[in-house]
Design a protein with these regions (language model features):
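Asp-box/BNR beta-propeller blade signature and adjacent active/binding-site loops
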Residues: 17-375
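Bacterial N-terminal signal peptides
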Residues: 5-14
Length: 375
């Protein structure tokens, strides 16, 4: 074998599908790579999935480019998409959807929503230089995701950084109300004290109203993830620096939120993903069940990636198990989509070694519905 061919094979292997340690291999969970890291595109993450009218799946995510601060939150990234014809096992047809514009630091954190009426909506955040201002953009597609057209802004040139971070989402409630959780403050993204709000729209996204703020100590409340119960009560999980996820509730479809409370689950400062479990009234929470460490720069590691389940609307939780638990890895920026069969596609940012920003892959865990029942 020639030396050149050997080097090519080594390079391909280095960025192939994720290698799952033996202790993480589970028959009910399959791990796939949606976008691998390369020299020119060192980081991809923060994904969102929706089903297209032709039953294919579309994923959107941000992809960083090499250059100054490449791979870091304030590097240059754009919004890309891929599609899957096999329920998330393989992803193809990469396409850039939203480019950076003049005055952007980057365009980040997209989310897709296909409404009950069949509309396909896309949001993405234009972060402006120095991380102290942003614009939240809304797009719509009338041709099954082949193209997206601007539908206006949820906010424009904010005073202080407003964002969704690694937990981007746009929800449609049972009533048809659109709901967008976000957080921010009056300063720089990396130094400001944060509150969480929700924007809500009852006219398909033409106009938006804002909820009351959700506040916590230290860096504040961040990266809200929302689930709706049958009685239309909402539950929100929150990223905090206080020892683990906190929870907040709304009984009026997101217009007002009660004071957040501890979840009883331990972890550092990292995002969560809260979802209703299909075929049950329960909710599940994906989070990093790490030891809280007040001396750690993020108050704990972002491993293991764990799932907990609650049968009483988040009052108590039991750990189902770990999705991944490599002690040298980092798993965060989570999103979960359920297929028509009830199986989960959990997207996550994968970095190994943890906290490196030179090689970050966008991966997905394909989780059989039975896994959540312990079988």
């Amino acid at each position: 074998m020639s030396r050149l061919l050997l080097l090519v094979l080594v390079a391909i292997t280095a960025f192939s599908a994720p290698t799952v340690p033996a202790f993480d291999q589970q028959p009910s969970i399959q791990h796939v790579t949606i976008e691998r890291a390369t020299k020119n595109t060192p980081r991809s993450d923060t994904a969102s999935i929706a089903q297209l009218p032709d039953d294919r799946l579309m994923v959107v995510y941000h992809k960083y480019e090499s250059g100054t601060r490449s791979g870091h939150d304030h590097g240059v990234c754009r919004i890309w998409s891929k599609v899957s014809e096999d329920d998330g096992k393989t992803w193809c047809h990469p396409r850039m959807l939203v480019d950076v514009a003049k005055g952007d630091m980057n365009v980040q954190a997209p989310a897709l929503l296909r409404t009950k009426a069949g509309a396909l909506l896309l949001i993405s955040l234009r972060a402006h230089p120095k991380g102290n201002s942003s614009t939240m953009c809304l797009f719509g597609s009338t041709n099954g995701g082949k193209s997206f057209s601007p539908r206006g802004f949820l906010w424009s040139r904010s005073n202080g950084q407003l964002l969704q971070g690694g937990t981007s989402s746009l929800l449609e409630l049972k009533s048809g109300r659109l709901l967008l959780p976000y957080h921010g403050g009056a300063g720089n993204q990396w130094k400001q004290k944060n509150s969480v709000w929700c924007l809500y729209s009852d006219d398909g996204g033409k106009s938006w109203q804002r909820s009351n703020p959700i506040d916590l100590s230290k860096r504040g409340a961040m990266e809200g993830s929302v689930a709706e119960f049958d009685n239309e009560t909402l539950l929100m999980s929150l990223r905090t620096q206080l020892g683990g996820p906190f929870l907040a509730r709304s009984v009026d479809a997101g217009r007002t939120w009660c004071k957040p409370v501890v979840s009883g689950l331990e972890g550092g400062e990292s995002g969560t993903c809260l979802r209703r479990l299909p075929g049950s009234g329960d909710v599940i929470l994906f989070f990093n069940n790490s030891k809280y460490n007040k001396d750690h720069h993020h108050f704990g590691e972002r491993t293991p990636l764990t799932c907990a389940r609650s049968a009483d609307q988040g009052k108590t939780w039991r750990i189902i198990g770990n999705i991944l638990a490599d002690p040298r890895a980092e798993y965060t920026n989570l999103d979960c989509f359920f297929t028509s069969q009830g199986d989960a596609i959990l997207t996550y940012m994968y970095a190994r070694p943890a906290w490196n920003r030179d090689r970050i892959q966008l991966n997905a865990a394909l989780i059989a519905r039975r896994w959540f029942d312990g079988s």
